[in-house]
Amino acid sequence: MTAFSSPSSNAASSATDRYQPLALEERWQALWKEQRLYETQDPKPGQRAFYALSMFPYPSGTLHMGHVRNYVITDVIARVQRMRGDAVLHPMGWDAFGLPAENAAIERKIEPGVWTDSNIAQMRGQLGRLGLSIDWDREVATCHSDYYRWTQWLFLELHAGGLAYQKDATVNWDPVDQTVLANEQVDADGRSWRSGALVEKRDLRQWFLRITDYADALLDDLDQLQGWPERVRTMQANWIGRSIGAEIDFQVEAHPGTSITVFTTRPDTLFGVSYLVLAPDHALVDQLTTSEERISVTAFRDLMAELSQDERTSDDQPKRGVPTGAVAINPANGKSIPIWIADYVLADYGTGAVMGVPAHDVRDFSFARQHELPVQRVIEVSGTNEHVNDGEAWAGPGTLIHSAGFSGLSNDEAKTAITNHGAENGWARAKRQYRLRDWLISRQRYWGCPIPIIHCDDCGAVPVPRDQLPVELPTGIDLKGAGGSPLARAEDWVSVTCPKCGKPARRETDTMDTFMCSSWYYLRFADPHNRDLPFNATSVNRWLPVKQYVGGIEHAILHLLYARFFTKALNDRDLLQTKEPFERLLTQGMVQGTTYRNPRTGRYISPAAVKDESNPLDPDDGGPLEVLFEKMSKSKHNGVDPAAVIDRYGADTARMFILFKAPPEKDLEWDDADVEGQFRFLQRLWRLVDSEVNHDGVSPATGESDSDIRRAVHQAIKAVSEDLSDDFQFNTAISELMKLSNSLSSGLAQASPGVRQEAMSALVRLLAPFAPHLAEEFWQRLGGEDSVHCQPWPDHDPEALVLASIEVVIQVKGKVRGSMSVAADCSKEELERLALASDVAQRWLEGKPPRRVIVVPGKLVNLVPSS
């Protein structure tokens, strides 16, 4: 960064009597850009590195208020840390691959890259108007080959480490977007996270990453993330879903050598198993189903194929199932038990089979009663007077009964004992089970990062040599074909020679899940111009982990989990030192706008159609409308265009409102009146600074006025500094600025020149992170050197907070009778002496000594008369 210099036509000389934000903001933005004010500087010896990062946006072309809130929050944090002396990295980029661009390109008959680059240019300009302290020299776009070259390089690195592999799998197929979805991209209703279509199941050969290899590390290391919201850590823990128990093998009668393996967290209940249940699509169902049950099993499986996972496993309906006719042997006692298939067992969870213990599992009990299956109690409640009815299941602790040699053990003791017994006899083993599945990264779409693999009939799947990266996307191909990847139709691109044997071969035509590119972008920002590697270890280790990450809670499982996996995997390959990418995480709340909804039809009405806001009525049926605050969206007619707000009030007002209206983690309700209120506050500051700039230098300063002003200033410094540490209570920090401005407006004129200068310097520096343009203007008009954003954050002076004198109440028999002004550090003995000598004591004690004197230092003296 070059030495900062204000415009040659001094800001003060161009100032007017009115606050005109647009011209002022444009002028300072141009100067900051010209002088590269926010260019990242490597930390000096002893200087802390602070990496502040917002989750980078998809370039839709339009900035919305959710974006504004995210980026302004991060910007304030970056600005404060820079003023506190840290070396700050605050970059921005674009998560630019994905289906929306591909679909838009098909609709407009242009290349997705053209559409995306146009949107990036538009959004970059919109972000620029917010006055963000971003180092644009580090900008990246995941759709540009100089970025996705390194996504491919990292894929090959994971492939070399055995973490990337291909297999045939039953996958989630989106029939609208014509692509495969990861499990995390299918909601609880079985619908695609993006298109909303009901997801179908298909068998395809797909690429996966072994995220399950890191399940324990991903779960256990959540305890280290004390700077993350507890809600996010809980969501990740539940998604990983570690269960500790045992795998148990049940042999199948009449099928020698065939066994069914179940996973259970309750091996202590093994003697109570009265049936087994398989998932309808379990691999053994066809083999085990008898001819007598074939028709009913086939019909049931067809029915299950039409239902979503949520519909199958919902607790709101009875559990459905049919017998296969096959029988298994309980290895613990040799008893024969029937094998069923049921809706609530899923093939891709656990082993796809469960053991039914109706006496000690509520769901199993319901299923057994419904289908008249036997119930055998094997756990007895012990140590309590609690009675378990025959008509209910007991899932709590107790003592084993009816369990052969294990009877009398506590259920915790029995878990280990029965598992060990099974292990000794070859039918059980201790096991950890996870809900987490390997990450499916194949996508049958065009606009994504090509997978750098070549398929050879002789050599199999061969990695593209790294010196041949990037494998670039071809242009000019038909994107509209149904089914399969559009890349498969680019024959000239697909046909290559095998790097291993030189024979004809074909490129992989699937592209990567867009989350592949966003799982490591924070690393590239540390070294964005490196042409030899995705990042240099020295640069990454200098800046990582990200000190403060800001983004929506909707990314709690997908992006944040994948990024943690990537970091751990790359750490294991000695590419970086940190094992966690983000030290602190702030999940900002949504920005909500007023909606008008017809409760009779569910239709949302445009605010423009509502004539009377105090009594909103539907213009069509005349009935009353519900007035709600909901997340801004086009369909609900409640969006607010950031550009329109900036055009009317300026970026500083928009920033101040966003920060003041609600704590960052809470939802924010948009209110035009409050926006206007912030604009008026900035106007008051303008007049305050204008008054100081035009002050004649003469003041009737007194020691008392100076101490009052300094006390107000240093109280504000202390309070704002605390509000901007850890919890980031921007709203209360701005409240403190308002209090300070009120104090200065009423008392500054009576202060000495030195105190006035101290007060205004502190006010402007405290304002700088929130309203950077106006603070810069004020700083220059007040004669400050360099940029205000290069100034040190003010420190409060504890001595300035000490009051010179205080008022102490005098009570007689507990009733207030007067007060006295005393030194703030007045001792208890001195307070008693002064109270007894006061006119109040002379009047109410009538010259008699009190029976008792109660002194509360700093607050009151209570005189208790002798009679």
Curated annotation (Swiss-Prot):
Its EC number is 6.1.1.4. Residues 309-319 have a biased composition (Basic and acidic residues). PROSITE patterns: AA_TRNA_LIGASE_I (PS00178). Its main location: cytoplasm. One of its GO terms (molecular function) is leucine-tRNA ligase activity. The gene is leuS. This is Leucine--tRNA ligase. It holds the Pfam family Anticodon_1. Keywords: Aminoacyl-tRNA synthetase, ATP-binding, Cytoplasm, Ligase, Nucleotide-binding, Protein biosynthesis. It is found in: Cytoplasm. ATP binds at K634. NCBIfam families: leuS_bact (TIGR00396). A motif ('HIGH' region) lies at residues 57-67. GO terms for biological process: leucyl-tRNA aminoacylation. Residues 308-327 are annotated as: Disordered. InterPro entries: aa-tRNA-synth_I_CS, aa-tRNA-synth_Ia, Leu-tRNA-ligase, Leu_tRNA-synth_edit, M/V/L/I-tRNA-synth_anticd-bd, Methionyl/Leucyl_tRNA_Synth, Rossmann-like_a/b/a_fold, tRNAsynth_Ia_anticodon-bd. It comes from Synechococcus sp. (strain CC9311). PANTHER family: LEUCINE--TRNA LIGASE, MITOCHONDRIAL (PTHR43740:SF2), LEUCYL-TRNA SYNTHETASE (PTHR43740). The keyword Aminoacyl-tRNA synthetase applies. It comes from the Bacteria. It catalyses: tRNA(Leu) + L-leucine + ATP = L-leucyl-tRNA(Leu) + AMP + diphosphate.
